[in-house]
């Protein structure tokens, strides 16, 4: 929905700010997103790795399935983009029947987002639901 948070040295942030301005980027009410990012950095930074490990588990399992592929090199956060060899809209419908909410993306893809409330058991349910395709 809104992307990510950029973290770095003051020099790096100044350079990024300049590039953002040159390309016309900007969000006037960024404070709400910034507050959420700061809260995460202050309270959840240590557990973000858990999301990344779970995302990697999902990506590797789905990539091994016949109907799907994942660019494993691109899985470096909590997001997994799945290329579907069957209609992504059908995948979304089937996942919903397993209690997993998702939406299809352009180019016959779906995105799996692992977050604070996704457990190891949920990861196994996600994998099983994809395997049922």
Predicted regions and their residues:
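Active-site C-terminal subdomain of aminotransferase-like
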Residues: 1-84
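Conserved C-terminal alpha-helix-loop-beta "cap" of PLP-dependent enzymes
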Residues: 56, 63-132
């Amino acid at each position: 929905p809104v992307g990510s948070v950029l973290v770095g040295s003051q020099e790096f942030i100044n350079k990024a700010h300049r590039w953002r301005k040159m390309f016309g980027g900007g969000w006037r009410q960024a404070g709400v997103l910034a507050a959420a990012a700061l809260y995460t950095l202050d309270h959840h930074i240590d557990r973000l790795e858990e999301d990344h490990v779970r995302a990697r588990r999902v990506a590797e399992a789905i990539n091994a399935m016949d109907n799907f592929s994942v660019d494993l090199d691109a899985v470096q956060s909590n997001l997994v983009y799945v290329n579907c060899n069957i209609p992504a809209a059908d995948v979304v419908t089937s996942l919903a029947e397993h209690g997993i909410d998702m939406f299809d993306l352009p180019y016959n893809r779906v995105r799996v987002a692992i977050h604070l409330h996704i457990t190891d058991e949920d990861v196994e349910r996600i994998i099983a639901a994809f395997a049922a395709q």
